[in-house]
């Protein structure tokens, strides 16, 4: 029996992308800039002893040529010498969540998704009219690019008074719809998003995201954990599909199942927040009998701290992640492997609030994994190729196993 565990540190880029300037992201480096700037926010310095023992600082230096300044602490990882480390370039046309995850699963996105304008009005009037008519809503609020946590404080009370849901977008390929979980209704919000997902297809939009929230007045509204993503299906079989077809178990934790539209997933586990995501990951790894994949997305790095340009929060989240990492070791069998990686960057020191085009780390450890610098990889798909080789699945012919 063997397991492949993928820990996706959403948005934890390590700089050095050769095409960063083409995306307006020259010099962006999520890892390095957090390490350099965290002390200015009252921290004593970024301490990631367990990730560092697995080669994270080396991977960062491979990507950008600069070594991140980390506080030296003793690692608790017994498998510190059983790790391959490197960095990976992205070949997909975008720097969004879907592109990064699909490419890592063996299906690069060669043509960028469609995007709605960031300026008001973001959404075509005829599309909005069709959605309103089909869903039976009196209209919409927002209709612009916005931070989801900010716009519910701005328009939450008006939403409650009018019954109009809040529509907004971002630099990613998406339409996000926020509504009060109780007053508007969670199932009603989900149905609205299903209708909207059908209507955005001609615009090649990757996702419609339901964003339920709770509270009574502006300044006191909070998102609930019942987010749901409606995403396009990958255009070709991913490593998840191939694993499922071969009889392997594929456990998707957090938003992973939604990102792949449920394709290739045998078990979906809902969780939110770093603590619960870690708890569920450890539980699922321990309970998995037989060959399989456990895949977790740690979304807080992106959603809570990257987009909000919160250096302090991001740094503290990284250190929490690092402290939990040794708990995984005792659950690993002789043939199990763990991948630690990311889907894109989101440098909290960079102007704006968008993702940043960066290389991402790839750390692979396990009891039988030799210590090795695997260098600069040409595509995220190398992870899919490596998992395919491990389980004897048909290769993708896109990347190279390591």
Indicate residue ranges for each PLM-predicted region:
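Feature captures the catalytic ectodomains and active-site-proximal regions of enzymes
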Residues: 1-402
